[in-house]
């Protein structure tokens, strides 16, 4: 889903805000979250996101996995809600990313049939004109420079490949492995074989949603969802 989205990263009190002296507070961020969650998120999850979000961005940026820039004046979506910021800062855009650096992995990132050669901040949505010099656009096309969600996922993928992190395609997550009340891994199906993968530090759930799985939609969503805008592979299993 992220690969065909605008790729905006939304984090309160993020490092870019701190560098530019844009004010934000833990209290405002939590108030904004709680005005939107319909009482369905627990405080531990909300507070962990607000308290550690900036640190997570700093960690990934220092390792080349992110290159983010403030979308000047890009407001929170629900401005009438408590804690909302009207002057921007929390929303971050991705610098263009060179997909040729991915080698054979460059065609593994889903495009949905469209590749954007601009940063969001260059478009009217991000405060820009939406116009790029033809010679510059030619350079971007020839160099396979991509923006938006493609840049976000491409850069994360490159950081993983640079560290020889094994990436399994066409792999379905089946269940989480528990030991003494702790999640220690996951059982997956890869190449028709069910395999247990053990984790030393934790398991990150980043499966992209489940809006194409009828059973999960019926179980977990409050109402019908008939026309998802995401890839049909979003079935909740990775």
Regions found by a protein language model. Name each.
Residues 5-6, 163, 182, 199-201:
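Short coil/turn connectors at secondary-structure junctions
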Residues 50-191:
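Conserved redox-cofactor binding core of oxidoreductases
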Residues 12-68, 158-159, 237:
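Conserved FAD-binding subdomain of flavin-dependent enzymes
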């Amino acid at each position: 889903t992220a690969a065909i989205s605008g790729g905006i990263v939304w984090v309160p009190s993020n490092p870019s805000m701190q560098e530019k002296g844009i004010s934000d507070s833990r209290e405002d961020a939590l108030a904004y979250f709680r005005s939107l969650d319909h009482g369905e998120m627990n405080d531990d999850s909300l507070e962990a996101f607000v308290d550690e979000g900036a640190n997570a961005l700093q960690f990934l940026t220092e390792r080349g996995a992110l290159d983010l820039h403030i979308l000047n004046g890009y407001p929170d979506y629900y401005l009438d809600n408590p804690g909302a910021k009207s002057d921007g800062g929390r929303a971050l855009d991705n610098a263009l990313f060179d997909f040729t650096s991915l080698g054979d992995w460059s065609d593994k990132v889903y495009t949905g049939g469209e590749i954007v050669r601009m940063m969001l901040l260059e478009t009217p949505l991000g405060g820009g004109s939406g116009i790029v010099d033809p010679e510059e656009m030619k350079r971007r096309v020839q160099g396979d420079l991509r923006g938006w969600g493609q840049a976000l996922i491409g850069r994360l993928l490159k950081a993983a490949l640079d560290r020889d992190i094994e990436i399994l395609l066409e792999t379905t997550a089946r269940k989480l492995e528990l030991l003494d009340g702790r999640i220690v891994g996951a059982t997956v199906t890869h190449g028709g074989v069910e395999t247990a993968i053990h984790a030393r530090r934790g398991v990150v759930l980043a499966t992209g949603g489940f809006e194409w799985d009828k059973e999960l939609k019926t179980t977990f969503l409050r109402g019908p969802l008939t026309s998802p805008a995401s890839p049909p592979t979003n079935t909740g299993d990775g």
